[in-house]
Amino acid sequence: MEIKENTANEEKRSISFVEQLVEEDLAEGKNGGRIQTRFPPEPNGYLHIGHAKAICMDFGVAEKYKGICNLRFDDTNPSKENNEYVENILNDIHWLGFEWGDIYYASDYFQKLWDFAVWLIKNGHAYVDEQTAEQIAEQKGTPTTAGTASPYRDRPIDESLQLFEQMNTPEAIEGSMVLRAKLDMANPNMHFRDPIIYRIIQTPHHRTGTKWHCYPMYDFAHGQSDYFEGVTHSICTLEFVPHRPLYDKFVDFLKEYDGTAEQGLNDCRPRQIEFNRLNLTYTVMSKRKLHTLVDEKLVNGWDDPRMPTLCGMRRRGYSPESVKNFIRSIGYTKFDALNDVALLEAAVRDDLNKKAIRVSAVLDPVKLVITNYPEGQTEMMEAVNNPEDETAGTHEISFSKELWIERADFMEDAPKKFFRMSPGKEVRLKNAYIVMCTGCTKDADGNIVEIQAEYDPESKSGMQGSDRKVKGTLHWVNANDCVKAEVREYDRLFFVENPAADERDFHELLNPESLQVRTNCYVEPFAASMQPGQYLQFQRTGYFMADPDSNSATPVFNKTVGLKDTWAKQNKK
């Protein structure tokens, strides 16, 4: 007997494992049914698309479950942080379309963290170690062998308190002392083997100036900041899985410190949940390597359109919706994977197809003369802005005797399946007339410098004569009414699929042809008037956006992505 389930009234749902865990906590009434997340960037660089995945999760969970997502800058290392990064992080989150609740800084809690560290020392849970970094590392042991206790591990509490105070003075020498948590040197989790929780840094802080000379380590500040703010779900990437026991241990200490441990260690505390990072083919996400690319001028700054940074993608012409759609499509799992950058580009194409204005631009021009078109005459043709969006309207493009077309759209001796322009064949000039090629002119070196054709006056778009079947349709611009432009075409920054896993120096993996600049391009005036932030499709070529380097004399355009995936074709060969 076959049993059929009646699912007609069931809501079809597809949620991530993170959302499942959040829903379990809500069902159990944890944290009073309250949801609070946070996005905690360190202001030591620009956000990249990997951060966008975390942003979508942090803000998405809060929005879905009617909670709040705050923004917290983990600014515990003044030697690498500044306000430039803070401002750009704010801009990038806004660009993605998210709104935070409150803005916090780990530096807001420096005094509270200091007081907590003093409490740890007084209760025998921390000590000042005067060994070198190398000595401490040697004593850590291995995952299968216990570590060796520091000779300072059992120093008197009063002595550690006095030295800890000395660490926070202008005279303290960086590296001379650290504060370590006194945990378990035999724990198989290496992070538990008396981790360093404070170190001396004499660089002025971008917010607190020279008030502090001793700063908390990330593992000491992060969970405590979550706890201070009332975060319910601390969502992070998989590399923090081994850090979770330490995160929980410090929260346990905090609950003892503030007197809430008696109410239950599991009450009102943040829960750390880890998901897989976003890794892309032909891309590096390492902040260190991205810094190197910028510092060594291997790219033109953090917003170079070849960079995986959000500001670079924005400048290149990616839409925030395409980035978010891509992230939704790859999902969140417990396993790291390498995602094909072609999937991101497909998401960009799909979104820009719906919103990009179609314009005419010729990147490799050759002159086309319509020999039977009246001398000195100009006509205005109507061009649809976006066939996918009726509300986008139209604009006018001028037509005259002399035009520019793409050099690749002409062949003097064309094969049978070449449906573009060649002698004796008809093609349609988009939004204009059907023309027949009658010949071409070459220079002394045999290069084609001009193409001739005749037009059919009855074949104008919209007229009855335009209905006849012509296989080829070409784009063009009026040679007497166009604007010379610069076009920057971008390719993969690295020529190997997984540069992060390649053992060679990553400098050797850079694609020398990742940027091609064309300076002899022509665009219609309507295209030249476009500003950065307006999405364009150069017909039959790809998606583009005006660059901030544009000026009234020479507009500059960045190629966002081609109409088709050219790399897929290359890989099939």
Residue ranges and their predicted role:
Residues E11-L90, H206-T237:
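N-terminal catalytic cores of NTP/NDP-binding nucleotidyl/phosphoryl-transfer enzymes
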Residues Q263, D267-A347:
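Long, charged, mostly alpha-helical binding arms that flank functional sites
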Residues L71, D75-N77, Y105, W119-L290, ...:
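Active-site cores that bind ATP or allylic diphosphates and position pyrophosphate for catalysis
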Residues D295, F326-K573:
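Substrate/cofactor-recognition hotspot
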Residues Y85-Q111, F116-W119, G124-Y127:
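A glycine-rich helix N-cap at a beta->alpha junction
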Residues P40-P43, R72-K80, D102-Q111, E134, ...:
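Conserved short loop/turn motifs at secondary-structure junctions
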Residues M1-R13, K572-K573:
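Basic/polar N-terminal segments that are highly enriched at the extreme N-terminus
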Residues G29, D58, I89, L120, ...:
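Residue-level signal for inorganic ion chemistry
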